[in-house]
């Protein structure tokens, strides 16, 4: 749907549903609501799904100060366990793709409780595997890594997996292990995923595994050469005809990233723009945020600072609206990095400290956000705030950080950054 058609569809569907409620036609509201959830999911009209689904369930996450009193639900008598499961699942998926990832995990948990207790009519083993896949993705995206491991352990015990979902399960394990800095198991899991892909002669699966292997070398090992190698293999194995819209956007962005790391800035900008436009074909994907952030980085590296700041600021607004935790922290990190390069050290410090406060609040993966720590150490050092610098080093230690820190405290005018985080510009670190 284009934006205008999407808006009209959303307004029409939710207005009819609300009319049934105002008329106290609760059974009709349930009938229309469940039918509409299915059709609006197909249109990727997630706002309507969330509006209708949360109203039918009368179930929203409680804040710490909220009363524990249950809200009367006039729809409950007209929904059996199967209907409730499908509504919870639809709302969870809508939040996973479009809005608040933490909310998504909440509704997935509720859906899974029903799935454990009841046999859901016409919900096949493939449907169950797909549920675990999406549930684990929601946990990963929400930075709920403990929950992600629990879900994947459930998935591992499930006997209805086929080769594809064996591949998916090990792939998701690798992503979680990387996030929690268990690099040995991350590599074992991604290699198992890659082994399945090769045995099944599925190059598209290989492409996905190579992408995630590249992220291990990029984030854990800060290894530029192998980052380029495995992203290039992912691009080489990619089959566009078999790809989802989201995967198409991912592979375009990864190809752009390789061009960025190899100083092909014009090609990188072209591909990043393609990735963003591809992602925009889906209403509300996280890949939109990731692609726009990358585009901003490329613009900055191409001496288009004004365009880069505009791109990042737009991305920051959208990231905040959707509570994209990694996106928010990365964007503040990149704004801080850009200010460092402009010798605007006070706003650089403000951006980086805001990024660090959110990094702590969101409990996102330390492995993913090394550039934040490098840059914050640098800004504290240059501003003479040695107390904050030293405390941060003690708290945020990871491999490579000691040698960087030792260069800072030595007072050396020339900080050497070869062998550190691959994405850097004039010895300042950016995050994609």
Model-found features: residue ranges?
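Amphipathic alpha-helical segments of tetratricopeptide repeats
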Residues: 17, 37-38, 57-65, 72, ...
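Extended alpha-helical scaffolding segments used for macromolecular assembly and cargo binding
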Residues: 1-98, 103-107, 120
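Eukaryotic tandem repeat interaction scaffolds
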Residues: 272-341, 345, 350-365, 369-371
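Residue signature of alpha-solenoid helical repeat architecture, marking inter-repeat boundaries
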Residues: 7, 11, 27, 82, ...
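Tandem amphipathic alpha-helical repeat scaffolds
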Residues: 18, 34-42, 86-100, 127-143, ...
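TPR-repeat structural position
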Residues: 13, 26, 46, 101, ...
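Acidic, Ser/Thr-rich low-complexity linear motifs
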Residues: 7, 67-79, 120-125, 247, ...
